[in-house]
């Protein structure tokens, strides 16, 4: 089970044996690259922040010490950071994609399947946001210090501003940038860290026919790889953990880790990064109106609210699973 199996082979059909030291070296190399991607993201945000603050210097200097940036400078910072991150990490992912594990799981989505997939992801997004809100309402009162910190954060203009540009930055630019970074770049590098047998996959030089499915490798490789479930979940946990840590606080980090696992599974199931982006978009956008769904809570009570959440998640997962089921395959 622990080895990377070829689609048409058994566990005994393995390539070169890789020593323990080689495995450790491979894992260290690719995990260092994943951490490097996170550091690059931090550096980009820092550079954009300095540039935006320089442009709005007069307005920023008028803000009392200790207070957060608000108004136009904040919105400009959110938009500029989102665009910069999206351009850099979408570009990096497009470079990695032809030689990626995800590319080998990709299947064609006609318009009908894409519409059903989007509908399923919308249900999941609303259900996940409702579930997070309900769980936090139960858990946060037990930890007053974390509750106060989180309430202050969510009450800040970053999340409460409903201007179009601000909502676009949170609901569109952030999902594109974060999914390209974590479920694209970091997830791919994490898979390489735990699957050293697949080196021919990322060493080959893809031709212009790559996206049409015709592979021309300079390094021989099996026509298809099947990553075992333990290795997938190990790589998925790595990217989700880094996703949670990047959020910078315990409460957001905890549910970002859980969401990262879901986003990773969604992309892996479909073999397409846009599925994770759309789900992330649905989760973030529903943040702005999930409070309005409290009418369900008042009308039906806790049980009714929970039933509504379970129904949304169950319908979303079932529909998405049906849309992305591969013929003759029972794997996730």
Where are these regions (language model features)?
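Alpha-helical transmembrane segments in multi-pass membrane proteins
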Residues: 37-98, 147-148, 306
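Hydrophobic residues within alpha-helical transmembrane segments
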Residues: 238-242, 278, 282
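Juxtamembrane helix-loop-helix connectors linking adjacent transmembrane helices
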Residues: 57-67, 71, 101-177, 187-227, ...
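Residues that define the loop-to-transmembrane-helix transition and helix capping
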Residues: 233, 251, 271-274
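Hydrophobic core of alpha-helical transmembrane segments in multi-pass integral membrane proteins
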Residues: 38, 82-94, 123-131, 305-324
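C-terminal membrane module of polytopic membrane proteins
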Residues: 281-332
């Amino acid at each position: 089970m622990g080895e990377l199996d070829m689609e048409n082979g058994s566990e005994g059909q393995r390539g070169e044996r890789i020593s323990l030291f080689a495995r450790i070296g491979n894992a260290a190399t690719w995990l260092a690259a994943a951490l490097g991607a996170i550091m690059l993201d931090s550096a980009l945000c820092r550079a954009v922040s300095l540039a935006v603050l320089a442009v709005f210097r007069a307005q920023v200097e008028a803000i009392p010490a200790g207070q957060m940036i608000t108004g136009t400078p904040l919105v400009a910072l959110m938009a500029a950071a989102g665009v910069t991150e999206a351009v850099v990490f979408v570009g990096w992912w497009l470079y990695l994609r032809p030689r990626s594990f995800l590319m080998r799981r990709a299947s064609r989505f006609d318009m009908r399947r894409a519409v059903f997939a989007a509908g399923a992801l919308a249900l999941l997004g609303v259900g996940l946001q409702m579930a997070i809100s309900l769980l936090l309402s139960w858990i946060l009162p037990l930890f007053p210090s974390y509750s106060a910190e989180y309430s202050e954060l969510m009450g800040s203009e970053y999340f409460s501003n409903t201007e179009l540009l601000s909502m676009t930055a949170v609901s569109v630019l952030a999902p594109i940038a974060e999914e390209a970074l974590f479920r694209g770049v970091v997830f791919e590098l994490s898979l390489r860290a735990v699957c050293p047998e697949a080196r021919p996959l990322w060493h080959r030089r893809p031709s212009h026919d790559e996206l049409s499915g015709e592979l021309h490798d300079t390094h021989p490789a099996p026509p298809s790889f099947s990553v075992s479930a333990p290795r997938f979940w190990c790589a998925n946990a790595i990217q989700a953990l880094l996703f949670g840590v990047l959020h910078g606080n315990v409460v957001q980090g905890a549910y970002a880790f859980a969401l990262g696992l879901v986003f990773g599974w969604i992309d892996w199931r479909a073999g397409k990064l846009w599925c994770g982006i759309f789900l992330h978009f649905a989760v973030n956008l529903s943040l702005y109106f999930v409070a309005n769904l409290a009418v369900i809570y008042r009308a039906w009570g806790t049980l009714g609210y929970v039933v509504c959440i379970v129904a949304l998640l169950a319908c979303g997962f079932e529909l998405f699973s049906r849309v992305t089921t591969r013929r003759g395959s029972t794997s996730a």
